[in-house]
């Protein structure tokens, strides 16, 4: 199992004290999906994209934005980047179409919004937030979600403009190989996500995906499902997950990780226990990012790789593979 943590000693030394007695740090952690090894030709682009997304989220927090603002902003950046399987660059289903899923949650009051199987929306995470804030519901799907988007003034983006040459070739390759995705081989699992802690101690998560390549039409995975694709609760923490969607759904991975936090485990221990359970029970591989209410964070995965980046106290850390962490200070101005 691979782990990225905020210090060489394994975790921050912040004690688990009541929120009123601590100085809340601004924290943003993002991931670009747990999958097979990323080709050398793409690593630089992926690293650059994930670092930009984390920086965007952190800058939103620095400017006084909320945790919800930060995770939406970070995930929007990744949806707009063709190197990631969300928004522009989403993988294609068996019919060669895009069907995207996303969810978002505010840990302050457990407000949540999600959409699934949307086609002509460039930024599904923005639509998920509107579901959270402008409807009495938590989840809209397919045509209903797209009608709601039109009602909210979100412009339609022709599906063909969201499709890239890389995703076309990816689908062709999968059809030739005739391989259904196995739980222990998440080569087609791409998801993006973010978690954040703001200056008021509020937590949030957002997750967005194009799903798995060559999936059945109408297939919905874990990403839009609250508790599986992510969860946020100010009393516990915030999580965004990635990996084999069916396995993540079956174990409710995000809430499972926070259950272990609730039982007094560190973020590292909680992530390990949750991912190990999914692997031992279902052979499911994946990853997650997790922040607790005091600002401790971890990025952990059982898949071959997982692009991630985190910003805390003005310091950016990022990586893709095990033992590959780069650190730099962000500009102070």
From Swiss-Prot:
<dbReference type="InterPro" id="IPR000246">
    <property type="entry name" value="Peptidase_T2"/>
</dbReference>
<dbReference type="GO" id="GO:0008798">
    <property type="term" value="F:beta-aspartyl-peptidase activity"/>
</dbReference>
<feature type="active site" description="Nucleophile">
    <location>
        <position position="191"/>
    </location>
</feature>
<feature type="binding site">
    <location>
        <begin position="242"/>
        <end position="245"/>
    </location>
    <ligand>
        <name>substrate</name>
    </ligand>
</feature>
<dbReference type="GO" id="GO:0004067">
    <property type="term" value="F:asparaginase activity"/>
</dbReference>
<feature type="binding site">
    <location>
        <begin position="219"/>
        <end position="222"/>
    </location>
    <ligand>
        <name>substrate</name>
    </ligand>
</feature>
<dbReference type="InterPro" id="IPR029055">
    <property type="entry name" value="Ntn_hydrolases_N"/>
</dbReference>
<comment type="similarity">
    <text>Belongs to the Ntn-hydrolase family.</text>
</comment>
<dbReference type="GO" id="GO:0033345">
    <property type="term" value="P:asparagine catabolic process via L-aspartate"/>
</dbReference>
<keyword id="KW-0378">Hydrolase</keyword>
<keyword id="KW-0963">Cytoplasm</keyword>
<protein>
    <recommendedName>
        <fullName>Isoaspartyl peptidase/L-asparaginase</fullName>
        <ecNumber>3.4.19.5</ecNumber>
        <ecNumber>3.5.1.1</ecNumber>
    </recommendedName>
</protein>
<keyword id="KW-0645">Protease</keyword>
<comment type="function">
    <text>Has both L-asparaginase and beta-aspartyl peptidase activity. Is highly active with L-Asp beta-methyl ester. Besides, has catalytic activity toward beta-aspartyl dipeptides and their methyl esters, including beta-L-Asp-L-Phe, beta-L-Asp-L-Phe methyl ester (aspartame), beta-L-Asp-L-Ala, beta-L-Asp-L-Leu and beta-L-Asp-L-Lys. Does not have aspartylglucosaminidase activity and is inactive toward GlcNAc-L-Asn. Likewise, has no activity toward glutamine. May be involved in the production of L-aspartate, which can act as an excitatory neurotransmitter in some brain regions.</text>
</comment>
<dbReference type="GO" id="GO:0006508">
    <property type="term" value="P:proteolysis"/>
</dbReference>
<dbReference type="GO" id="GO:0005737">
    <property type="term" value="C:cytoplasm"/>
</dbReference>
<dbReference type="GO" id="GO:0001917">
    <property type="term" value="C:photoreceptor inner segment"/>
</dbReference>
<comment type="subunit">
    <text>Heterodimer of an alpha and beta chain produced by autocleavage. This heterodimer may then dimerize in turn, giving rise to a heterotetramer.</text>
</comment>
<dbReference type="InterPro" id="IPR033844">
    <property type="entry name" value="ASRGL1_meta"/>
</dbReference>
<dbReference type="Pfam" id="PF01112">
    <property type="entry name" value="Asparaginase_2"/>
</dbReference>
<keyword id="KW-0068">Autocatalytic cleavage</keyword>
């Amino acid at each position: 199992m691979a782990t990225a943590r905020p210090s060489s000693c394994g975790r921050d030394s912040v004690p688990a004290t009541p929120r009123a007695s601590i100085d809340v740090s601004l924290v943003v952690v993002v991931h670009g999906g747990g999958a097979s090894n990323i080709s050398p030709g793409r690593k630089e682009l992926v690293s650059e994209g994930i670092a930009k997304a984390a920086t965007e989220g952190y800058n939103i927090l620095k400017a006084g934005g909320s945790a919800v603002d930060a995770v939406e902003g970070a995930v929007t950046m990744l949806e707009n980047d063709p190197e990631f399987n969300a928004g522009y660059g989403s993988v294609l289903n068996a019919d060669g179409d895009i069907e995207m899923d996303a969810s978002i949650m505010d840990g302050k009051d457990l407000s949540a919004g999600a959409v699934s199987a949307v086609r002509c929306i460039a930024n599904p995470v923005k639509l998920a937030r509107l579901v959270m804030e402008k409807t009495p519901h938590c989840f809209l799907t397919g045509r209903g979600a797209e009608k709601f988007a039109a009602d909210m003034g979100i412009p339609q983006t022709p599906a063909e403009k969201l499709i890239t040459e890389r995703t076309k070739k990816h689908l062709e390759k999968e059809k030739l190989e005739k391989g259904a995705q196995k739980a222990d081989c998440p080569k087609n699992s791409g998801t993006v996500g973010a978690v954040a802690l703001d200056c008021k101690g509020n937590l949030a998560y957002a997750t967005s995906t194009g799903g798995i390549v060559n999936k059945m039409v109408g297939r919905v995975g874990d990403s839009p499902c609250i508790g599986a694709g992510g969860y946020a609760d100010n009393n516990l923490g915030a999580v965004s997950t990635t990996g084999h969607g069916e396995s993540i759904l079956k174990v409710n991975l995000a809430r499972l990780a926070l259950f272990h936090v609730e039982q007094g485990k560190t973020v590292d221990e909680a992530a390990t226990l949750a991912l190990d359970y999914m692997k031992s029970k279902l052979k499911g591989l994946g990853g997650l990012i997790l922040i607790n209410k005091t600002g401790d964070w971890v990025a952990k995965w059982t898949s071959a790789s997982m692009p991630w980046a985190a910003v805390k106290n003005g310091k950016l850390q990022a990586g893709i593979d095990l033992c590959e962490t780069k650190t730099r200070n962000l500009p102070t101005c």
